[in-house]
A protein has these predicted regions:
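Conserved beta-strand-loop-alpha-helix hinge in the C-terminal portion
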Residues: 77-107
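Hydrophobic anchor residue at the start of the ABC signature
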Residues: 11
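Helical segment within the ABC ATPase nucleotide-binding domain
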Residues: 36-50
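Conserved signature/switch motifs of ABC ATPase nucleotide-binding domains
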Residues: 17
Length: 118
């Protein structure tokens, strides 16, 4: 089974349990770009229909903007703490191919990148 298929199965199994909250740690980290895009679309669709609260760890700024209502940015190690919280106020449902065309996307992206650079 490919890595992408294993990720799909893992996400499907998690949602099949009907959790009230879902914790995801770099769920797309080991995937190629095409598989990542497909799974992002699947995750957005499932979240739209299931309305499950999810907490996700990611280092991908664009992924964070697409999937999040709030992005909690952590300071560096070894004593990491909350450094900033960005409210992402983009309309839902979000479509991956359209989010980057929204006028506020690059404002959010710039805010996140600025935090990461300092």
């Amino acid at each position: 089974m490919s890595q992408g298929m294993r990720q799909r199965v893992g996400i499907a199994r998690a949602f099949a349990l009907k959790p009230k909250m879902l914790l995801l740690d770099e769920p797309f980290g080991m995937l190629d770009s095409l598989t990542r895009a497909e799974l992002l679309d699947v995750l957005v669709d499932v979240w739209s229909s299931e309305k499950i609260t999810a907490i996700m760890v990611t280092h991908d700024v664009d992924e964070a903007i697409l999937l999040s209502d709030r992005v909690v940015m952590m300071t560096g190690s070894p004593y990491a703490k909350v450094g900033d919280v960005l409210k992402v106020d983009l309309p839902r449902p979000r479509i991956r191919t359209e989010v980057m065309e929204h006028p506020d996307f690059y404002k959010y992206r710039g805010h996140l990148l600025n935090f990461l650079e300092h």
